[in-house]
Amino acid sequence: MQQDSAFLLVDIVLVLAALLPLWLAIGFTVRSPLNFLQVLLWMPAAMFTAFLWRSRLHGRIPEDIDGAILISNHRSSADPFFMQMASRRPIGWMIAREFASGPLIHHLMNILDVITAGRRGVDTAATKRVIREAKAGRLICMFPEGRLNTTEQFMQSCRPGAIMVAIRAGVPVIPCYLHNLPFSNVIAQPFYTPARVSLFVGEPIDVVKLANGQTDKATLQRVTIHCLKEIARLAGIHDWEPEMAGKNWLKDQTS
């Protein structure tokens, strides 16, 4: 009888332990703008950022901000996980369409409401969607480099798309800097590589005011360089000069 009671107690403990993540997800969903499925997907990401990558957050995205474009250096496939640490609100992000082509990945990206875009040329449909959603109050993360930086450079050449989107949506740009990500362009590598990552969040930049509402090439380049230098300042770098990407930026990167 005592042995049966012990087994029953163990079974109850195991069931409760198995249900704990579910109860946590339900509780967080009630308090969060994320829906239940998004919470279930983000919970493992939160575990990775807290324990495997021992992440530290310096600054947060203002809770009362009505839409913004987040920009950051881009070192790993896990970068969006760190960006989400900075806000209770769901942060959307853009990824290259080829990385969401598989049926399972495509379904997961739909749940997370990720925006897919082509990397060659201008993806008009994706750009219009980002402008529309940022204008409606959503936080969107865009990486000006447009590809992973696996070089020794602070940042590679950048494009002005994120700044153009922010100006047309009438929202600020929030610069962020990810520090100490020792990862490569192997997508899975971050998930088995311990690290001590820090995310620095800067002050919102009124790019509409800086650009006087204009999106001509010269204005976009000037405002983009200003925003990129703010990322460098978060890294403690004050003498870095950003490089703007040319038309063949992707070809140059892969050659």
Where are these regions (language model features)?
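Non-catalytic C-terminal accessory region of glycerolipid acyltransferases
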Residues: 2-15, 125-255
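Hydrophobic core of alpha-helical transmembrane segments in multi-pass integral membrane proteins
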Residues: 13-26
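N-terminal signal-anchor transmembrane helix
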Residues: 28-67, 107
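Short, flexible loop segments at the rims of nucleotide/cofactor-binding pockets, characterized by
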Residues: 46-53, 70-71, 116-120, 151-153
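A generic structural signal for well-ordered alpha-helical segments
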Residues: 48, 86, 109, 133, ...
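Glycine-rich, highly charged phosphate/nucleotide-binding loops
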Residues: 54-56, 121-126
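Residue-level "edge-of-site" marker
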Residues: 61, 122, 179
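Catalytic core of membrane glycerolipid acyltransferases/transacylases, capturing the structured
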Residues: 63-121
